[in-house]
Amino acid sequence: MLRGMARLENLLGVQALAVVDRMTGNDLAPSESAALVTLLAHPGSGIGWLADVLGLTDSGGTRVVERLVAAGLLARRPGSDARSRVLELTDQGRTRAEAALSTRERELAQALEPLSDSERQTLERLLDKIVARLADDRPSALHACRMCDREACAAGAGRCPLEHTVPPGGLP
């Protein structure tokens, strides 16, 4: 591998970890913060679905949910049938998810601050290409975007580089 490429990869990795570290805070694991942010965008989801999005086993997803329920950030509610349960953020959980997204926005804005408008536009175009290759189906796109501000890539604000993973006609 070219030495310059290794340095670029290292710099991207350092920046990504710094943002995630600051988003999660001291009392939540990254998977717990990701669960809150994901459920903010997808309320009423089940544990199995959440585990898939987070890239966890079913038992790993259950442990994350148990910790969030114990912390008062998440509640289980009856699902559409007698056996199913859905997950809902509590008011405190919603506040924590929104705080994580605000921290993410602030940290990324600070990271981009030294760049000129032209450099930011160039970086956005380059990252569009990189991010578009992260997923080729909906489950992997949801995993890639588990800490995303969903409104930032909404129709009026731009286009999600992973929109190609949405089935024709939209999501069910």
Regions found by a protein language model. Give the residues of each.
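C-terminal regulatory/oligomerization modules of transcriptional regulators
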Residues: 121, 125-172
